[in-house]
């Protein structure tokens, strides 16, 4: 494993843990989250899942790209399912679509070797 692969893997896991934590605490405990409108919330979802996806792709895991990105999408789906049952959160289908757009954008950029 190259040095950069390890670096990206560490960032990938830190990102997953951070997003997982921020997704299960009540939204009112996150500063400025209430100030987000619908569009900025969806943009934030896309950027977060772009970040996670590009870090996962740059990590050079032995998983295939489709499998890695499917697992990242399932991570987002699990978060939304948790939100459905969370008293201070709510499930939004649009969040899943924003997550998916971030994942596809990361794949597109990675495939074009821009990353």
Model-derived features with residue positions:
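Alpha-helical transmembrane segments that form the membrane-embedded catalytic/substrate-binding core
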Residues: 45, 49, 91-110
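Alpha-helical transmembrane segments of multipass membrane proteins
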Residues: 17-20, 54-55, 77, 81, ...
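Structural signal for the C-terminal ends of transmembrane alpha-helices
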Residues: 56-62, 108-114
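Short helix-capping/hinge motifs at transmembrane helix termini and TM-loop junctions
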Residues: 25-26, 60-61, 87
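"…centered on the first transmembrane helix and the immediately adjacent amphipathic helix/loop
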Residues: 1-54, 68, 72
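Membrane-helix interface segments
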Residues: 6-7, 61-69, 92-93
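Interfacial helix-loop-helix junctions of multi-pass membrane proteins
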Residues: 30-38, 79-100
